[in-house]
Amino acid sequence: MSFSRRADFSGINFGYNTGFDIAYSGTVGAAMEALINGIPAIAFSSQHDGSSDVTDKYLVPVIEELLSSPIGRGEIWNVNFPGCALEDCRGILRERIPAPLCVFDNHYDKTEQPDGSFILRPYAEQLSPDRAPEGSDIHAVFNGYVSIGKVKSMVLPSSDKSTHAWQRVFPVLFVL
């Protein structure tokens, strides 16, 4: 495999980087750091239960595809490999958007103690697959697909031609 351009690969993270979880992902954050430095980037994540067969099969073809695919200024690729057996993987879904949800719904159970104090215990429940919006990254991985999508930087200018006020005030910060 030969690469025609320099790129940053971040990951492979254990656990999905989908939906709202992208916001605090170190894997996606590292890819964004590369982007800030003008380097195209791909963030990879995988949810597996002891087997990396799906990742092993799809990783190189996905890398080859994405390195030859155009991506907008201010965007990175985000790839998530499903947590299923290879025989249950249904292929690749492209152009997945981040779901407006988290894979795990986090709660705290509050228990009052006899002395009047409280104990808070964290509790996480996995999102029901039927709640994942169709076309989203979570829907793809929950249904046994490799999910490929773009994540846009909220700080860097996008590839569209619009000029935001902050770009006019701080133009030197946005040169790639």
Regions found by a protein language model. Name each.
Residues 1-6, 14:
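Proline-aspartate-enriched helix->loop->beta-strand connector
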Residues 35-55:
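Glycine-rich phosphate/pyrophosphate-binding loops
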Residues 16-25:
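Glycine/threonine-rich flexible loop motifs
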Residues 56-176:
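Electrostatically charged, flexible surface regions
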Residues 1-3, 29-40:
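Alpha-helix C-terminal capping segments
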Residues 14-17, 48:
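A short, flexible beta-alpha/helix-coil linker loop
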Residues 19, 51-54, 158:
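Secondary-structure boundary/capping motif
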